[in-house]
Amino acid sequence: MVLAHLAAQGRQDRVSAASFAVTVLDWARAGTVSALMDEESVRAATERSRKKGYLDGAQLAEVFAWLRPNDLIWNYWVNNYLQGKPPPNFDILFWNADTTRMSAGLHRDFIDVALGNQLTEAGGATMLGTPVDLSTVTVDSYVTAGIADHLCPWQSCYRSTQLLGGKSRFILSTSGHIASLVNPPGNPKSTFQVAGDTPEDPKEWLAQAETVQGSWWPDYMTWLGERSGEEVPAPRELGGKLEVLAEAPGTYVFDK
């Protein structure tokens, strides 16, 4: 939406490229998560977050867990509670458990965009008073998806290549919503698929896609490098000239 706003303001040249990681822009193709998007349920949810001022991160994580209860709920209930075994040492699970609150205003905006599928039509949404038209976003884009993603089906992520106005490079990685992203080089099981162009039909793209062994991260680094400025020496010290508000990671971590 920010990119469309900049395009409307004639300032899109401030951005060299855009990246969309496991992101759904067309909510008519949102997959299993769309089962939660009926009018009554979402209005009740936004009213609760409005009263509190935020959507609790643990509550949001619980909603997503119930989309895959066998894997994300009962599996651990049997292992940890019934069998008394310790949870597996898995870095992604640890990271996934570190939830973050969402402000009530942002929660409401997300709901409005999703319910009305506002990003698929020019002017369906506004950004700082500017009608949003994704077709005016003409910078190159790098769009990634996970072949086993239950939250953002890869076909839904692929749809973004048709909504944006610039040239897109679509990458289909192994694994699901999180593991397709947290996919560093060195895993012998990792592969990704890529093709030279992005036809309208995702099945047509898949039929012509080439399978590449390894992580997609090096491909992404190359793509970014081709659209970035000249390399400069790294600063000797961290930080900038702005006033420090608090020590990292911030005061929010102490809220209960």
Task: Label each residue range with its predicted role.
Residues 3-107, 225-256:
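Alpha/beta-hydrolase-fold enzymes
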Residues 96-132, 139-140:
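Mobile cap/lid helix-loop segments that gate and shape the active-site cleft of serine hydrolases
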Residues 111, 160, 220:
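Hydrophobic, well-ordered secondary-structure elements that form the walls
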Residues 137, 143-145, 149:
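Short beta-strand/loop motif that positions the catalytic acidic residue
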Residues 148-152, 177-179:
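Acidic catalytic loop of the alpha/beta-hydrolase fold
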Residues 153-163, 174:
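Short alpha-helix in the alpha/beta-hydrolase fold that links the catalytic acid
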Residues 169-256:
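Catalytic active-site module of serine/aspartate enzymes centered on a nucleophile-bearing elbow/loop
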